[in-house]
Every structure is written in structure tokens, then in C-alpha cells.
Regions:
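Cytoplasmic helix-loop-helix junction between adjacent transmembrane helices
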Residues: 67-106
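Juxtamembrane intracellular "pre-TM" segments in multi-pass secondary transporters
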Residues: 153-188, 391
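Intracellular juxtamembrane helix-capping segments at the cytosolic ends
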Residues: 77-90, 298-312
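Helix-to-loop junctions at the C-terminal end of transmembrane segments
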Residues: 21-32, 234-247, 342
Length: 406
């Protein structure tokens, strides 16, 4: 399949991820995060079995799209249900740090271990792509059992709100928050931009690496592994830094601005090196360094989830739904940008667009100042939502003093 076709297929998957990521938070308020995680693991495993055992073996096009797409409902329910769980039980002053540790595990799994397993399976064990997918399913089962059996915290095993019987109000609270508080929308936009390049690069960068740079596909997998392996320790680091120096300030400099600069370097450095006739090994080494810097910069967005919860601390699931929507939207928007723009402007144009998006995110980060107690003139005892941006009086305008903290 060419780049545009892959982009369309992954976009279908991404739409499912976006929907599931949003409802994972609302359902966590309603049912409790652990039940949402069980549902997510079940959906993924069952649909992956259908995808591998039936759709691919019969080469049925519509069934491949259906099972691959619906499978996208699984992992957000599991992963972001767990993120809501952490956000609900972490003390406010350490919330960004707790989220940072979540992303240590997330980055160690999906992009890092995933790329490493693919490298070993394809290059060392000489398995096919199909065989590698079966190995990935085994890892999903193992990881699901580890989380569901190993985590014993009690609050996440029950609804996070006091009135779970009011199903409609609980499920739609996140939507009302998006409607009434523009900062909630900014959270969604920033979180989408944070991950759009990584999902887009997964679609168009392999062809760029093999076709333009004339490197083997294994080098793309190594680059991906380096980006997310280096990212790991900086997730809790930037979480702690945000808790101590300011969430919005950390995101602006360490996240948005740094991502714009390092993504540009990651794309331009190998092209410049080859045009100058530098040794291939040196060019690849410089590319890995740029990739590592990009991985560090991606961690600069960790404090964003703490900002999301601060907008409605009495309903952490609803508040996190605005953040999770951005996570899921990135899975769809990234490949969609590739499908639409790659035929028109190529890899270079796409990269310029994504650098521009990071600069837009930097501007939006400035609008989130004043959401952290103890910073930007907000008293430490007060909630960040004392002044509603849209003149709203609904969710997102409550103060921590009048709302139970998670």
C-alpha cells in the first residue's frame, strides 16, 4: 500500500481511538477506571483475534478495515482509563509527576517496546509482519493481566463521582466543559498537536527514510526506539518540573517551542548531511541525536493533564475527557494530514506544517496560565478556574475550595 492508502486506513483506526479516548474518561466517572480498563482489554484482544485470524487470512478488504478500525476502541479505554485513575488519586501538588510516571510506562510500551519487538522479530528472528502481530497480541495479554491483577488501589474500583446514577449528566459533563470553558478546548487542541507529528511520521517517515535517504527500514525502527527510549526518564522529570516551576511555563518552553525546533532538526539534519557528502554513519548518528532531543521535548507536555483536571477537580473523569479527546484526535489527525497533504506537498511540506502546529501550541499554552494553584497570581488554596474564560458558570468555573479534590 502507498503512503496515502495507509494514511486513510490508519485514520479510520484513529477516529475509533478518538471516540474511545473521550468516553474512557466519562465512563471512569460512571463505572470506575478499573472496569473501563477491563472493557478496553477485552475489546482489543477479541478484535485483534478477528483481525489476525479471519480478516487477514481471508484477505477481505471490508473486514480488514472493520476489525482494524473497531480495534481502536480497545487501547484508549484501557490506557486512558488508567490515566484517569492516576489523575483522580494523585495529590494536586504531585499530579503532573504522577502523570509523568504514567507516560514512562506508556512510552516504554507502545512506541519503544513495540518498535524494538518489531526490529527483533523481523531482523533477528526473521519472522513475517503477520507473525510479529501475533507476538504483539501476546504482549497485550501479558500487560493487561499485569495491570488488572497488580494494581490494588481501591478508589479506582468504584465510580469516581457521588451520583453515578445520573448517567446522562455524568457522560455529557465533559462535553459541557468543552462548550463552556475555552481553556478546556485549548487542552484538547494542545494535546492533539503534541502527538500529531508522531502519528503522522509513523505513516510517511518510513517511505522518507527508505526512498529519500536510502536507508534500510531498520534504521527507522532504531530511530523510533531512540526517540521514545530517551523520552522515558524525562516524563517524570518534566512532571516534577511543572509542579515546581509552573505547568504552563514548562509546556511552553520545554514542550511546544522545543518540539518545533527539534522536529525541524530531525528532518533537516540527515538531508543536510547527505547533501554535504558526510559519511553515512555520521549522518545517521546525528539523526539519532536529533531524534533523542525530539523525544526529550515530547515529554515537555506532561503537565497538560494536570491542567485539565484542575478545570473541574470534582469530576476528574469529565475533566480528563477533554485531554483524552486530544490524544485520540491525534491518532486520526496525524494520518489524515498525511493522506491529504503528502500527495500535494510531500514530506518536506508536511514537516513544515507540523513545526507550525507546534508554534500554534506554544501560543495556546500562554492562555493556560493561571490554572495552577500557587502560580501566576493564583493563591495556593484556590482552584485555577476562578475566572471563567467564556463567562461560563458551568463546569470548569468551580474552585477547589468548593469542590472535593480527587
Amino acid at each position: 500500500m502507498d503512503v496515502a492508502v495507509v494514511g486513510r486506513l490508519v485514520t479510520v483506526y484513529g477516529v475509533a481511538v478518538a471516540v474511545a479516548a473521550f468516553i474512557a474518561a466519562a465512563l471512569s466517572d460512571l463505572w470506575g477506571p478499573r472496569r473501563v480498563m477491563v472493557l478496553g482489554a477485552t475489546v482489543w484482544i477479541v478484535l485483534e483475534l478477528l483481525f489476525l485470524g479471519l480478516a487477514l487470512t481471508t484477505d477481505t478488504g471490508w473486514l480488514i478495515v472493520l476489525t482494524y478500525g473497531l480495534r481502536g476502541f480497545g487501547y484508549p479505554l484501557f490506557a486512558y482509563g488508567f490515566l484517569v485513575w492516576i489523575s483522580a488519586v494523585a495529590p494536586p501538588e504531585d499530579r503532573a509527576t504522577g502523570v509523568g510516571w504514567f507516560y514512562v510506562a506508556f512510552s516504554a510500551g507502545l512506541p519503544t517496546l513495540g518498535a524494538l519487538v518489531a526490529t527483533v522479530s523481523l531482523s533477528v528472528l526473521d519472522l513475517t509482519f503477520y507473525g510479529t502481530l501475533w507476538i504483539s497480541l501476546g504482549l497485550v495479554v501479558l500487560g493487561s493481566l499485569t495491570a488488572l491483577v497488580g494494581v490494588r488501589e481501591r478508589r479506582g474500583r468504584r465510580p469516581l463521582v457521588d451520583n453515578p446514577g445520573d448517567v446522562l449528566a455524568t457522560v455529557t459533563r465533559g462535553l459541557r466543559l468543552l462548550r463552556d470553558d475555552r481553556r478546556a478546548r485549548y487542552v484538547t487542541y494542545i494535546r492533539t498537536i503534541n502527538s500529531v507529528p508522531t502519528y503522522a511520521m509513523a505513516v510517511y517517515f518510513p517511505a522518507h527514510v527508505t526512498g529519500t535517504l536510502h536507508w534500510p527500514l531498520g534504521r527507522f525502527l532504531i530511530l523510533t526506539t531512540v526517540i521514545y527510549a530517551v523520552n522515558l526518564p524525562f516524563n517524570p522529570f518534566y512532571g516534577r518540573l511543572g509542579d515546581r516551576l509552573g505547568w504552563a511555563r514548562t509546556m511552553f518552553w520545554a514542550g511546544a517551542v522545543a518540539c518545533a525546533v527539534t522536529l525541524a532538526l530531525l528532518y533537516a539534519a540527515p538531508l543536510a548531511g547527505r547533501s554535504l557528502g558526510l559519511p553515512d554513519g555520521l549522518v545517521f548518528g546525528v539523526t539519532l541525536v536529533c531524534g533523542a532531543l525530539f523525544g526529550v521535548s515530547l515529554a515537555g507536555y506532561v503537565p497538560l493533564s494536570a491542567i485539565a483536571v484542575s478545570l473541574d477537580p470534582g469530576h476528574p473523569g469529565a475533566a480528563m475527557s477533554t485531554y483524552n479527546l486530544g490524544v485520540g484526535a491525534a491518532v486520526a489527525v496525524g494520518p489524515l494530514l498525511v493522506a491529504v497533504l503528502h500527495p500535494l506537498i510531500g514530506a518536506t511540506g508536511l514537516t513544515v506544517v507540523m513545526v507550525g502546529l507546534y508554534l500554534v501550541a506554544a501560543v495556546l499554552c500562554l492562555a493556560l496560565r493561571g490554572t495552577q494553584p500557587g502560580f501566576d497570581g493564583v493563591p495556593a488554596a484556590d482552584a485555577p478556574a476562578s475566572a471563567a474564560p467564556d463567562g461560563a458558570t458551568g463546569p470548569g468555573t468551580r474552585s477547589a475550595a468548593s469542590s472535593p479534590t480527587p
